[in-house]
Amino acid sequence: LFAEGTFNAAFIPSYAGALAKNKMNADNFAKKVFNLLFIILFIFVLVAEIFMPQLIFLIAPGFYKDPEKLKLAVDLSRITFPFLFFICLASFFGAILNSYNKFAAAAAAPIILNIVLIGSLFFSQWANISDVLTLSYAVSLAGFLQLIVLLFFARKNFKPILTTKIKIDKKIKFFFSKLLPSIFSSGVTQINILVGTIIASFQAGAVSYLYYADRVYQINLA
């Protein structure tokens, strides 16, 4: 939801509008949003890492019939879940760049994931280690690299400062009042995917088939 357009749809108009009036005020607003996003994502990922078995039960209850499959799902999910943290923060910096009419870096950043995944397969063959584990670590690494790349390009226009002291003013409240409806509307697609995964988890290989079908569906959306 945050990484695939919902956040940008709410943030860019607010930030760009503030930027047109006063850059300092716009940057203060962006810093508050960044710190809130950082804290929320960090807590969410940390809780998910701790309670991953329970999370897998909610997402794919059918895996509980096979202890070996369940353990693999939990282990791999714990490895790949930090990707969510990195990619959402990367999306934030992509929104900053878009607000300055700089689109190339944000548009090209997803290529990093493909390059890292392909490279990890060559590495796993060369090092004679598990393809599955290598790809899982590669996903989180790719998310981290996307964040670093977009931060590098955005730093000329915006420099984030991490702090836990965040004043929730009217602008922040207004921003989240616009973000919540976007989350609910965009969440319909995610709920469909979740329901499909829950049902598919009871059939061997069905989750993979569902994922491949979704990839085909996403082709026309780039």
What are these regions (language model features)?
Residues 1-222:
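Membrane-embedded alpha-helical bundles of multi-pass transporters/translocases
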